[in-house]
Amino acid sequence: MRSHATGPDPKYFLQSGPFSITNILSRAALEIQDPELHILGIDPFKRVSKKNLLLLGLLYKCKIILTNLVAKWLLLHMVGPTIGGISINYIALPVECFWNALVIRRVVKEARLRLFGFALCNHVADHVLEEGILHGLSESAKIGALRAIGNAVVLARNYHPNMIVLLLRWQHLLHLHKDHQYDDWDLFLEALRTVSTKERWFLLNLFTIAAAFDGRISHIEAVSMKDAYGPDYALYLPRLLKLTADLHAGRINAAAALCKIDFTAG
């Protein structure tokens, strides 16, 4: 399902819509693809070849079949058509069990990541409101904030709900509903160059949190971080890696401590 939403109602999306905590966890448990919602014009697959996406999907579907075939071929040539009177055709059962165990483990970890991400989105939003951080932001910095999250979504190259929930919360906090090319990388870099020093640190803090929220760092993210962080690369990269690792490992308290957003560097 593909849907376009230029100005979605964040309250609906987070409480009863596709990115409510119930629906987020249900999709993780059932391994259902997250909905393709181009919220505020942001296209997560902007830098992804559609042919590569199709190829990766086919490879993923074929891996269990290939594993069964390889296992049967090896057993047939090493021990013959039967093992203890049992046909090697039944070898598919333990292979299926092995893959199912891996899938269950991955699903549990992903569900935990989504649950913690949802909680941390609320934690970050509450902190920003309590500290009154948004009051002194320029219009360029406000738009830059959504570009920070929007470009993190593009760099991650998926519709991970943690990032979408973060985007919706910040859209609601900033009261921005028009499309300002939030997934344009060059405009985000320009904002980092033109806003004040403190606002730049604010944007980098938010960008770091958004980039870590799917619990992994892709190659394209690692390369792009140098352009975004600039002279502060050595300061922000360790925080990004630590936050990503804490989220992936389920260390929510450690992750929460790294989710600070203010006007200081690092």
Regions found by a protein language model. Name each.
Residues 3-266:
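Small-residue-enriched hydrophobic alpha-helices in membranes
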